[in-house]
Swiss-Prot record:
Family: In the N-terminal section; belongs to the FGAMS family.
GO biological process, one term: 'de novo' IMP biosynthetic process
Chief localization: cytoplasm
Record keywords, A-Z: ATP-binding, Cytoplasm, Glutamine amidotransferase, Ligase, Magnesium, Metal-binding, Nucleotide-binding, Purine biosynthesis
Active site location: 1139, 1264, 1266
Organism: Myxococcus xanthus (strain DK1622)
A Pfam family annotated for this UniProt entry: FGAR-AT_PurM_N-like
An MF annotation (GO) of this entry: metal ion binding
Any single Gene Ontology cellular-component annotation: cytoplasm
Designated name of the protein: Phosphoribosylformylglycinamidine synthase
UniProt-listed InterPro entries: Class_I_gatase-like, FGAR-AT_N, FGAR-AT_PurM_N-like, PurL_large, PurL_linker, PurM-like_C_dom, PurM-like_C_sf, PurM-like_N_sf
Length: 1299
C-alpha cells in the first residue's frame, strides 16, 4: 500500500464548527485539523514516475494553507470490506489514464489531528467520545495509525447462508428469527411460512425468509390499504385501495397506466422530441406524443435515522421509478417535501417551540432540515434533474385526549420525493418476458447497506433495535444512476428495436424483491447465480448479497438475441451490468451459489407470492374536541409570528441548493420576479426544447387539520393542490391528475378510523365530484416514534397526513401566472376570491400553532362545484390575459398571500378588510381556500363578470391595490390596523432561511445575502442589451444549407448535453453526441468536427475535483491527449466549455493555445451548491462567441458547487483581469462588478465568470448560457422579449465565425 497526502479536507469555518461539536463532548480539545489521505493498492511497488503521475492526478481542490498535524490522529476510512463510490470513480480515472496494470484500486481517507491543551494527545476514552461526530458508522471506520489503513485492501472470506430449524423447532424458531433478523412478520405470516415449509419438508434459509419478509412487508404490499375494515362495529364496503381506485373507475380519460407499474402515465401532447439518433449520434427531432409519467414517493424512515443519505436515496429511488416505467422512460423534473417537528434553531427558538425530547436513535428536526434537503438536492443535481417545487411544514403540538395529553408532530418526518418525465407511446406497457430471456442487473455493486429497509420502514420508529434501524438506511451514488439512465435513454431511443422487454428499479428489499417481481409479473420463474451479482463487499453472506438495498440498480429482461446490442450500450456509457440468469417456464426461483456449491433459494414462486390471509382491521373512532382559540397579542405581533413560522417563511435555503435548470426544459420554478422571491404556486416544464406546451406540477397538504377532522384535512389538501396548479394554463380541470401519499400511525387510538374517513372523503366523494383521478400514490403506515426517557414512556404521533401532488399537461407555458405584482404605478386592483363563502375557521392554522393551540373548527371544501367553477374561471381569465398576478390563500392565510405578492413585486399595499366582516384576526389569518388576483382597474368589471359566469359572483371582494411606497397598510374602513415597512416584513419572513443558511453554509455569505435583501434601492435583476436578440445573424449562412458538425462532448456523469445540443442545433449546426469512451476507444475522431462543446454536469461525480477526472483522463491518456491537442491547434476549430466543461477545459490549458491564463475552479465561497438567476456583463474580448454583445448586461443561470476562479496569487488574478480576456463578469442589480454574495455566487475575484483564449477560439464559462437560449427558459424575463433569448446570439455568432 502506498499513501499520498492530500489537501486540507475542511475550510476554516467548517473546522470551527467541528471544533465546537468536539468541545461539547470533550471540553479539553484545543484544536482540530483535517486533511485527505490517498491510499493506493498496487500489485507491485510503484516507480517514482508512477508516483509522480499519481501526485499530479491527486492535485485537486482549493490551494489553502495546511494546518498543524499535532495531537492525536484519527483516520476515518471507508468501512473495511467495502469499495466506496469515491474509490470506484477515482480508480476508473486512474485506469483511463493508463495506470490500470500498476494500480489495482485507490481509496481516500480523512486524517483528523486533534489536540488537547498545549498540543498534547488525547486519552483513548476521549477519542472514543469524539468518533461519532467524525464518521458515519454505516459506511466508515476509524483507525489510529496510518499503517492500519492497509485493512482496506485485505481479502475477505465469503460466509455461507444459515437455516432456521422450523421442522425441529416449529413456530418458536421462526419467532426468534423474526426478532433477530428484523423481519417484521405478522403472526398469520409466520403461521403461513411454517405450514408451507412443512409441506416442502425442509427448513427455510435465512435468504428465503428475508426475501419473503421484504416482498410481503407493509412497505411493499400495502396490507393496510388492501385490508377489509370494520369501524365502530360496522363492516365497511370497500378497502382503502378500492376507494382510491374508484377515482379511476369514474374518470379514466387521459390515463394510460395506473396502479400496476413503477409510475402512472397520463396523456401528453404530440411534440418534436429531441434526442440523438441511435445510428448517427446526431441530435434531432422526432414528431410523436410525449406522454407523461408521474410518481411521488416517501422516504421517511431513513431520513429520520440519517437525513442526508435518507433524502438522497429517496430522490434516487423515485427517479429510478420513473426511468423504469414501461420499457424505459426519461425523468424530467422533480418535487420535494418535508414535514418535521419543531426546528428550535439555536439562538432563534420560538415561544411555541416547547421542548419535548427525542430518542437517541433518530436525529432532531433541525438536523433533518440541515442535512436532508442537501442530500435530496445533491442527488437531483448530480443526476441532472431540476427540482422545481415542494413544501415544508414544521409542526408539533400537545393536545388533550381522553387518555391524557398527547404530543402530535413529525419526529418521524415526512420526506417526499416526486416528479414527472416523458415516455414514448410504444413503451408505456411493459413487454412480456419469455422463457430463456436474460435476467439482468444494471447499475452499481451490492453493498452491505439498507438491509431490511422495507421491513424496517414498516415498523413504528423505535420498535426495532437501533442497529437494525441504522442498517436499513441506504447510501447514494447519483453519478452511477446517471450512467444507467443514459443506457435506458439509448434503449428507448431505438423505438421498436428497444432491447428492454421489461424493467423494474431495485428499491426496498433489493434484488430479493425486484428479481422475483420481474419474473412473477410474467408468470415465470428463474434460474440465477448469486455470484453473478456485482459485489463491492466480497465478505458478505448470501442473505446480505441478495437482500441489501444498495442503490442505483435496475433489473430487466432482455431477449438473448438483443443481449449484444444492450451490452454495447452499457459499455459505451461505462454502466456496469451482469446477467444473473434466465427466466424459466417452471415457476420456481432457484438461486445457485458456485462459491459453496449450494442453493440459498429454491422456492416455488407461489410460496413467495401466495396469499397469506388478508388483513382485517377492526377499529374504533375516537371523537376529539378542542377548546376555542385564545389568541393573545396585537395584530402586528400575530402578523410577525405568522410570517416567521417556518411553514410560512421564506424557503430560499431549501431552493438555491438545487439545480432548477438542468436539461433546459424548466419554464417556471419557485423563484418569482426580478427580485427572485420563492413564492411560485406551481412548477412548469417544457414538453421539449422547442415547444410552448409543457407540464405543470403543484402540491397541497393541510395535515394539522386532521387533528380536528381528517376528512376535511384530506379535502383541503386536494383543494390546495388545485388552487396552486391553477396558476398554469391548463385546458380543463379533468386534465389534472393527482398522486396521493398517505401517512398514518396505524394502530394508534382513533387513527385507523381517521385514515379511513380521509381516504373515503377523497376517493369516494370529492375527486369523483371534481372529475379527478388518483392513478398513483404511496402509503406509510408507521408514523409514530416511541422511546423511554428517565423511566417514562414517550411518544410522538403524526396526524393522519395526506400529501397531494397535482400534475397536468400545459397548453401554453407563456401564460403561467405568478404572485409578482406588476405595473404598480398604474391603476390596478387586488381582488380576493373566497372559496369558503365567508367562513373564517381558524382551526389547525399557523396563527393557532404559534399559540400552541389547535382550535375547534377546521376549514373544509364544502362545495366542489365552487372549486370547479373557480378553476375554469381562472383558466378563462388567464387565456384572455386579464390577470396580472395570482396567488392562492394557504398557510398563514390572506396575510401571507398579500405579503408574498408584495415581496415578489417589491412594493407596498393598501388593503381594506371591511368587505370581509368585522373579525379582522379571522379574516387575515384563516386558511380557508381562496386566491388573490391583480387586475387592471379597467378590467375589474369584466373579471367579475367571468367569475359570476362560473358561479362566483358573491365570492369576489375588492381589497385594495398595490402601491409604489414600500409600506403594507391594512385598514378596516377608515381605521388603520397595521402599517409595516415591506422590507422589514421581508426580513421577518426571511429570518428562518437566514438562520438556517448561517448554520449550514459559510456564515459570511449568509450575512451578505441578508444585507442585500435589505437594500431599499435594489432595482431587481436589470438586463440591458446592446443588440437586438430577434435578429438572426446566422440566417444567411443557415440558408446555404451547410450544417457544420460540432461534438457535444460528455464524460460519465455529465448531464447537460441536451440543452447544449439544442442551442447549437437552433443556430444551424449538426450537433453530434460524443462520449469520451468513443474517443478513448478510437470509435470517434475529432477530425470531422469544427467545434468541441464540453457540457455541464458532474463528470466522475466530481471525484478529484470538479472537471479534474475528465481533464486528467485526457492529459494522461496518450490517444486522447494527441487527439485533443491536434484539434485545439487547428485554426478552423473552436470550443466552448460550460460549467463542468469549463472546469475541465481550464485544466487542459497546457494543450490549448493561448490559454495559459486560465484559472482553476474550486469550491464556492459559500461552500454550497449555488443555483440562481444571475446577471453578467459582457466585456470586449477576442472571443468569437460574444462579438456584437459587448456592454450587455444579461440574465444567466448559475448552477454549480465549484465555480470560484482560483489564481496562483492575488497579483495573478489582477493581471488576468487586465488582459482583455475576461469575457463575462458577475454584476449586481445596479450594474456594478459584483464582489459580494449572492450577486457573485461563487466568490470569484473581480467578478470573473468566463474567459477566452488570446485568439478567441476557445471560451470557458461557469454560468449556463445554453440553458436560457429561449426566453421561456427564464424564471423571470422582461415581458417584451420574443421567443429567442438574448443568449441565442452567442451560438449564432459561432455559426457566423465559421462562415
Amino acid at each position: 500500500m502506498h499513501t499520498l497526502r492530500g489537501a486540507p479536507a475542511l475550510s476554516d469555518f467548517r473546522l470551527a464548527k467541528l471544533l465546537a461539536q468536539c468541545r461539547e463532548r470533550v471540553p479539553s480539545v484545543s484544536s482540530i485539523y483535517a486533511e485527505f489521505v490517498h491510499l493506493i493498492d498496487a500489485p507491485a511497488p510503484l516507480s517514482e514516475a508512477d508516483l509522480a503521475t499519481l501526485g499530479r492526478l491527486l492535485d485537486y481542490g482549493p490551494r489553502v494553507a495546511t494546518g498543524a498535524r499535532i495531537g492525536s490522529l484519527l483516520l476515518v476510512l471507508p468501512r473495511p470490506g467495502t469499495i466506496s463510490p469515491w474509490s470506484s470513480k477515482a480508480t476508473d480515472i486512474v485506469h483511463n489514464c493508463g495506470l490500470g496494470e500498476r494500480v489495482r484500486r485507490m481509496e481516500r481517507g480523512t486524517a483528523f489531528f486533534i489536540a488537547g491543551p498545549d498540543g498534547q494527545a488525547l486519552q483513548d476514552a476521549e477519542l472514543e467520545r469524539l468518533k461519532p461526530v467524525l464518521h458515519d458508522r454505516m459506511t466508515q471506520a476509524v483507525v489510529g495509525r496510518l499503517e492500519d489503513a492497509a485493512i482496506l485492501f485485505a481479502g475477505h472470506t465469503p460466509r455461507p447462508f444459515t437455516t432456521v430449524d422450523v421442522l425441529g423447532g416449529g413456530r418458536a424458531a421462526l419467532v426468534t428469527a423474526n426478532r433477530e433478523l428484523g423481519l417484521a412478520l405478522a403472526d398469520d405470516e409466520m403461521d403461513y411460512l411454517v405450514a408451507r415449509f412443512t409441506e416442502l419438508k425442509r427448513n427455510p434459509t435465512d435468504v428465503e425468509l428475508m426475501m419473503f419478509a421484504q416482498a410481503n412487508s407493509e412497505h411493499c404490499r400495502h396490507k393496510i390499504f388492501n385490508a377489509s375494515w370494520t369501524i365502530d362495529g360496522k363492516p365497511q364496503e370497500r378497502s382503502l385501495f378500492q376507494a382510491i381506485k374508484n377515482t379511476y373507475v369514474q374518470h379514466k380519460e387521459g390515463v394510460l397506466g395506473a396502479y400496476k407499474d413503477n409510475a402512472a402515465v397520463i396523456e401528453g401532447f404530440e411534440v418534436d422530441r429531441f434526442f440523438p439518433s441511435p445510428e448517427s449520434g446526431e441530435w434531432g427531432s422526432v414528431r410523436e406524443p410525449a406522454h407523461i409519467m408521474i410518481k411521488v414517493e416517501t422516504h421517511n424512515h431513513p431520513t429520520a435515522i440519517s437525513p442526508y443519505p435518507g433524502a438522497a436515496t429517496g430522490a434516487g429511488g423515485e427517479i429510478r421509478d420513473e426511468g423504469a416505467t414501461g420499457r424505459g422512460a426519461r425523468p424530467k423534473a422533480g418535487l420535494t417535501g418535508f414535514s418535521v417537528s419543531h426546528l428550535r434553531i439555536p439562538g432563534f427558538e420560538q415561544p411555541w417551540e416547547q421542548p419535548y425530547g427525542k430518542p437517541d436513535r433518530i436525529v432532531s428536526a433541525l438536523d433533518i432540515m440541515v442535512d436532508g434537503p442537501l442530500g435530496g438536492a445533491a442527488f437531483n443535481n448530480e443526476f441532472g434533474r431540476p427540482n422545481l417545487t415542494g413544501y415544508f411544514r414544521s409542526y408539533e403540538v400537545q393536545v388533550p385526549t381522553p387518555g391524557g395529553v398527547e404530543v402530535r408532530g413529525y419526529h418521524k418526518p415526512i420526506m417526499i420525493a416526486g416528479g414527472l418525465g416523458n415516455i414514448r407511446a410504444s413503451h408505456v406497457q411493459k413487454g412480456r418476458l419469455q422463457p430463456g430471456d436474460k435476467l439482468i442487473v444494471l447499475g452499481g455493486p451490492a453493498m452491505l447497506i439498507g438491509l431490511g429497509g422495507g421491513a424496517a420502514s414498516s415498523m413504528a420508529q423505535g420498535a426495532s433495535a437501533a442497529d437494525l434501524d441504522f442498517a436499513s438506511v441506504q447510501r447514494d451514488n447519483a453519478e452511477m444512476e446517471r450512467r444507467c439512465q443514459e443506457v435506458i435513454d439509448s434503449c428507448w431511443a431505438l423505438g421498436d428495436k428497444n432491447p428492454i422487454r421489461s424493467i423494474h428499479d431495485v428499491g426496498a428489499g433489493g434484488l430479493s424483491n425486484a428479481v422475483p417481481e420481474l419474473a412473477h409479473d410474467n408468470d415465470l420463474g428463474g434460474r440465477l447465480e448469486l455470484r453473478a451479482v456485482p459485489n463491492a463487499e466480497p465478505g458478505m453472506s448470501p442473505v446480505e448479497i441478495w437482500c441489501n438495498e444498495a442503490q442505483e440498480r435496475y433489473v430487466l429482461g432482455v431477449a438473448p438475441e438483443d443481449l449484444a446490442r444492450f451490452a454495447a450500450l452499457c459499455e459505451r456509457e461505462r454502466a456496469p451490468f451482469s446477467v444473473l440468469g434466465d427466466a424459466t417456464a417452471e415457476q420456481t426461483l432457484k438461486l445457485g451459489d458456485t462459491q459453496f456449491g449450494n442453493a440459498p433459494i429454491d422456492l416455488p414462486m407461489d410460496v413467495l407470492f401466495g396469499k397469506p390471509p388478508r388483513m382485517h382491521r377492526d377499529v374504533t373512532s375516537r371523537p376529539v374536541s378542542f377548546a376555542p382559540l385564545t389568541l393573545d397579542g396585537s395584530l402586528a405581533l400575530l402578523a410577525e409570528r405568522v410570517l416567521s413560522h417556518p411553514t410560512v417563511a421564506d424557503k430560499s435555503f431549501l431552493i438555491t441548493i438545487g439545480d432548477r435548470t438542468v436539461s433546459g426544459l424548466s419554464s417556471r420554478d419557485q423563484m418569482v420576479g426580478p427580485w427572485q422571491v420563492p413564492v411560485a404556486d406551481c412548477a412548469v416544464t417544457l414538453s421539449t426544447v422547442t415547444s410552448t406546451t409543457g407540464e405543470a406540477m403543484a402540491m397541497g397538504e393541510r395535515t394539522p387539520l386532521a387533528l380536528i377532522d381528517a376528512a376535511a384535512s384530506a379535502r383541503m389538501a386536494v383543494g390546495e393542490a388545485l388552487t396552486n396548479i391553477a396558476a398554469a394554463r391548463i385546458g380543463k380541470l379533468s386534465d389534472v391528475k393527482l398522486s396521493a401519499n398517505w401517512m398514518a400511525a396505524a394502530g394508534s387510538p382513533g387513527e385507523d378510523a381517521s385514515l379511513y374517513a380521509a381516504v373515503h372523503a377523497v376517493g369516494m366523494e370529492l375527486c369523483p365530484a371534481l372529475g379527478l383521478t388518483i392513478p398513483v400514490g404511496k402509503d406509510s403506515m408507521s408514523m409514530r416514534t416511541v422511546w423511554e426517557e428517565g423511566g417514562a414512556r414517550k411518544a410522538v404521533t403524526s396526524p393522519v397526513s395526506l400529501i397531494i401532488s397535482a400534475f397536468a399537461p400545459v397548453l401554453d407555458v407563456r401564460k403561467s401566472l405568478t404572485p409578482q405584482l406588476v405595473d404598480v404605478a398604474d391603476d390596478t386592483r387586488l381582488l380576493f376570491i373566497d372559496l369558503a363563502r365567508g367562513k373564517q375557521r381558524l382551526g389547525g392554522s399557523v396563527v393557532a400553532h404559534v399559540h400552541g393551540q389547535v382550535g375547534p373548527e377546521s376549514p373544509d371544501v364544502e362545495d366542489p362545484a365552487l372549486l370547479r367553477g373557480f378553476f375554469a374561471a381562472v383558466q378563462a381569465l388567464s387565456e384572455s390575459g386579464s390577470l396580472l398576478a395570482y396567488h392562492d390563500r394557504s398557510d398563514g392565510g390572506l396575510w401571507a398571500t398579500l405579503c408574498e405578492m408584495a415581496f415578489a413585486g417589491r412594493c407596498g399595499l393598501d388593503v381594506d378588510l371591511a368587505p370581509l366582516g368585522g373579525d379582522v384576526t379571522a379574516a387575515l389569518f384563516n386558511e380557508e381556500l381562496g386566491a388573490v388576483v391583480q387586475v387592471r382597474a379597467s378590467d375589474v368589471a369584466r373579471v367579475r363578470e367571468v367569475l359570476a359566469q362560473h358561479g362566483l359572483s358573491r365570492d369576489v371582494h375588492e381589497l385594495g391595490r398595490p402601491v409604489t411606497a414600500l409600506q403594507v397598510r391594512v385598514r378596516h374602513g377608515g381605521d388603520t390596523l397595521m402599517a409595516e415597512d415591506t422590507l422589514a416584513l421581508r426580513r421577518t419572513w426571511s429570518r428562518v432561511s437566514y438562520e438556517m443558511q448561517k448554520l449550514r453554509d459559510n456564515p459570511i455569505c449568509a450575512d451578505q445575502e441578508s444585507a442585500a435583501r435589505s437594500d431599499a434601492s435594489d432595482p431587481g435583476l436589470s438586463p440591458k442589451l446592446t443588440f437586438d436578440p430577434a435578429q438572426d445573424v446566422a440566417a444567411p449562412f443557415i440558408a446555404k444549407g451547410a450544417r457544420p458538425r460540432v461534438a457535444v462532448l460528455r464524460e460519465q456523469g455529465v448531464n447537460s448535453q441536451q440543452e447544449m445540443a439544442a442551442a447549437f442545433t437552433r443556430a444551424g449546426f449538426a450537433a453530434v453526441d460524443v462520449h469520451m469512451s468513443d474517443i478513448l476507444s478510437g470509435r470517434v475522431s475529432l477530425e470531422g468536427f469544427k467545434g468541441v462543446l464540453a457540457c455541464g454536469g458532474f463528470s466522475y461525480g466530481d471525484v478529484l475535483g470538479a472537471g479534474g477526472g475528465w481533464a486528467k483522463s485526457i492529459l494522461f491518456n496518450p490517444r486522447a491527449r494527441d487527439a485533443f491537442a491536434a484539434f485545439f491547434a487547428r485554426p478552423d476549430s473552436f470550443g466552448l466549455g460550460v460549467c463542468n466543461g469549463c472546469q475541465m477545459m481550464s485544466q487542459l490549458k497546457d494543450i490549448i493555445p493561448g490559454a495559459e491564463h486560465f484559472p482553476r475552479f474550486v469550491r464556492n465561497a459559500s461552500e454550497q451548491y449555488e443555483a440562481r438567476l444571475s446577471l453578467v456583463e459582457v466585456s470586449k474580448t477576442p472571443s468569437l462567441f460574444y462579438q456584437g454583445m459587448e456592454g450587455s448586461r444579461m440574465l444567466i443561470v448559475t448552477s454549480h458547487g465549484e465555480g470560484r476562479a482560483e489564481f496562483p496569487s492575488v497579483e495573478d488574478a489582477a493581471r488576468v483581469n487586465g488582459l482583455g480576456l475576461v469575457t463575462t463578469r458577475w454584476v449586481d442589480n445596479h450594474g456594478r462588478v459584483a464582489e459580494s454574495y449572492p450577486a457573485n455566487p461563487n466568490g470569484s475575484p473581480h467578478g470573473i465568470a468566463g474567459l477566452t483564449t488570446r485568439d478567441g477560439r476557445f471560451t470557458i464559462t461557469m454560468p449556463h448560457p445554453e440553458r436560457v437560449h429561449r426566453s421561456v427558459q427564464h424564471s423571470w424575463r422582461p415581458r417584451e422579449w420574443g421567443d429567442d433569448g438574448p443568449w441565442m446570439r452567442m451560438f449564432r455568432n459561432a455559426r457566423v465565425w465559421l462562415g
